[in-house]
Amino acid sequence: MANDFLFTSESVSEGHPDKVADQISDAILDAIFTQDPRSRVAAETLTNTGLVVLAGEITTNAHVDYIQVARDTIQRIGYDNTEYGIDYKGCAVLVAYDKQSNDIAQGVDHASDDHLNTGAGDQGLMFGYACDETPELMPAPIYYAHRLVERQAQLRKDGRLPFLRPDAKSQVTMRYVDGKPHSIDTVVLSTQHSPDQSETATKMKASFTEAIIEEIIKPVLPKEWLQDTKYLINPTGRFVIGGPQGDCGLTGRKIIVDTYGGACPHGGGAFSGKDPTKVDRSAAYAARYVAKNIVAAGLARQCQIQVAYAIGVARPMNITVYTEGTGVIPDDQIAQLVQEHFDLRPKGIIQMLDLLRPIYAKTAAYGHFGREEPEFTWERTDKAAALRAAAGL
């Protein structure tokens, strides 16, 4: 990639239909883990106008009112009025869970290659990434795209912008100079709103546009990056019909929003609704943990990790490090340090990051990475000092 370029990432709010589905799936996982943290969970959700469908595979000793968990999640998000197309009180909730396949369970429970005998729950490849563009060691475009929709929800819920409704999307186009963030070229923010905020079907009131720019966008984005920035606020105009009424929502359809905004590859596996024996989730968290500690240690300015697994086998097929020429030691030496300092077997990951806890509902909106939350153990940089010392720095 050239040193001077534009790069764009997007995010969506907690009221986006796919994120409603993700949050219901993870709320169900948390409710199960509160009672039985050894459960096997693959909880999928579909949301549509007035309808929620819960399906997937769950093996547990927990007794959970799945319908109530779904309703509580929809209420927390803010869909509490039939005008919004889905209302937590009156929506239909259908439940169709099966148990985990015995064929899968035997491979996961009895891996043959290691005394840490939890095998991977499926084959697959996962990526982790970190860079020095923000203090959180995240790419700037996705980090700030998340903060925009997060603030939209905050101002909606606290009543400062009462005309906002739950569904929203953001997009940040960053200008890079010499490979580093220089300024924000364009911000797109589309937010659902009450009917009185549009002058016509294609034109919003000036007061609406001004409020979005002044109250949501400018307080979130670094002032020094707002140089001749273009603002596109509800560029198609009226956005009253939204959420599950506007589009059918499904768990696992926002995997780039959930990760790095396209700044690095994605293995294809979604996170929400999956217990940590599913390496789609746990190994992606571990790969972020590894990459973040490498950058925090000063071994590289940016770091991409790939790991891959075979179903029922504990040890990863590969651990590959790529620093795009920013490493202070060769990438293969960094990869060797990773193998020495991180246990990337599924059970090792679960122990290392303390993943058998009801911590997942919070991850299901505004990104799984780059957030300094106490539950987000994969965001710690507690291995950085040891890595730095081992590298001789």
Curated annotation (Swiss-Prot):
<keyword id="KW-0808">Transferase</keyword>
<comment type="similarity">
    <text>Belongs to the AdoMet synthase family.</text>
</comment>
<keyword id="KW-0479">Metal-binding</keyword>
<dbReference type="InterPro" id="IPR022628">
    <property type="entry name" value="S-AdoMet_synt_N"/>
</dbReference>
<feature type="region of interest" description="Flexible loop">
    <location>
        <begin position="100"/>
        <end position="110"/>
    </location>
</feature>
<dbReference type="InterPro" id="IPR002133">
    <property type="entry name" value="S-AdoMet_synthetase"/>
</dbReference>
<feature type="binding site" description="in other chain">
    <location>
        <begin position="238"/>
        <end position="239"/>
    </location>
    <ligand>
        <name>ATP</name>
    </ligand>
</feature>
<dbReference type="Pfam" id="PF02772">
    <property type="entry name" value="S-AdoMet_synt_M"/>
</dbReference>
<comment type="pathway">
    <text>Amino-acid biosynthesis; S-adenosyl-L-methionine biosynthesis; S-adenosyl-L-methionine from L-methionine: step 1/1.</text>
</comment>
<feature type="binding site">
    <location>
        <position position="18"/>
    </location>
    <ligand>
        <name>Mg(2+)</name>
    </ligand>
</feature>
<feature type="binding site" description="in other chain">
    <location>
        <position position="57"/>
    </location>
    <ligand>
        <name>L-methionine</name>
    </ligand>
</feature>
<dbReference type="InterPro" id="IPR022636">
    <property type="entry name" value="S-AdoMet_synthetase_sfam"/>
</dbReference>
<feature type="binding site" description="in other chain">
    <location>
        <begin position="167"/>
        <end position="169"/>
    </location>
    <ligand>
        <name>ATP</name>
    </ligand>
</feature>
<feature type="binding site">
    <location>
        <position position="247"/>
    </location>
    <ligand>
        <name>L-methionine</name>
    </ligand>
</feature>
<keyword id="KW-0963">Cytoplasm</keyword>
<feature type="binding site" description="in other chain">
    <location>
        <position position="16"/>
    </location>
    <ligand>
        <name>ATP</name>
    </ligand>
</feature>
<keyword id="KW-0630">Potassium</keyword>
<dbReference type="InterPro" id="IPR022630">
    <property type="entry name" value="S-AdoMet_synt_C"/>
</dbReference>
<dbReference type="GO" id="GO:0000287">
    <property type="term" value="F:magnesium ion binding"/>
</dbReference>
<keyword id="KW-0547">Nucleotide-binding</keyword>
<feature type="binding site">
    <location>
        <position position="270"/>
    </location>
    <ligand>
        <name>ATP</name>
    </ligand>
</feature>
<dbReference type="GO" id="GO:0005524">
    <property type="term" value="F:ATP binding"/>
</dbReference>
<feature type="binding site" description="in other chain">
    <location>
        <position position="278"/>
    </location>
    <ligand>
        <name>L-methionine</name>
    </ligand>
</feature>
<feature type="binding site" description="in other chain">
    <location>
        <begin position="253"/>
        <end position="254"/>
    </location>
    <ligand>
        <name>ATP</name>
    </ligand>
</feature>
<feature type="binding site" description="in other chain">
    <location>
        <position position="100"/>
    </location>
    <ligand>
        <name>L-methionine</name>
    </ligand>
</feature>
<protein>
    <recommendedName>
        <fullName>S-adenosylmethionine synthase</fullName>
        <ecNumber>2.5.1.6</ecNumber>
    </recommendedName>
</protein>
<dbReference type="GO" id="GO:0005737">
    <property type="term" value="C:cytoplasm"/>
</dbReference>
<dbReference type="GO" id="GO:0006556">
    <property type="term" value="P:S-adenosylmethionine biosynthetic process"/>
</dbReference>
<dbReference type="GO" id="GO:0004478">
    <property type="term" value="F:methionine adenosyltransferase activity"/>
</dbReference>
<keyword id="KW-0067">ATP-binding</keyword>
<dbReference type="Pfam" id="PF02773">
    <property type="entry name" value="S-AdoMet_synt_C"/>
</dbReference>
<dbReference type="InterPro" id="IPR022631">
    <property type="entry name" value="ADOMET_SYNTHASE_CS"/>
</dbReference>
<dbReference type="Pfam" id="PF00438">
    <property type="entry name" value="S-AdoMet_synt_N"/>
</dbReference>
<dbReference type="InterPro" id="IPR022629">
    <property type="entry name" value="S-AdoMet_synt_central"/>
</dbReference>
<comment type="subunit">
    <text>Homotetramer; dimer of dimers.</text>
</comment>
<keyword id="KW-0460">Magnesium</keyword>
<comment type="function">
    <text>Catalyzes the formation of S-adenosylmethionine (AdoMet) from methionine and ATP. The overall synthetic reaction is composed of two sequential steps, AdoMet formation and the subsequent tripolyphosphate hydrolysis which occurs prior to release of AdoMet from the enzyme.</text>
</comment>
<feature type="binding site">
    <location>
        <position position="274"/>
    </location>
    <ligand>
        <name>ATP</name>
    </ligand>
</feature>
<feature type="binding site">
    <location>
        <position position="44"/>
    </location>
    <ligand>
        <name>K(+)</name>
    </ligand>
</feature>
<dbReference type="GO" id="GO:0006730">
    <property type="term" value="P:one-carbon metabolic process"/>
</dbReference>
<feature type="binding site">
    <location>
        <position position="247"/>
    </location>
    <ligand>
        <name>ATP</name>
    </ligand>
</feature>
<keyword id="KW-0554">One-carbon metabolism</keyword>
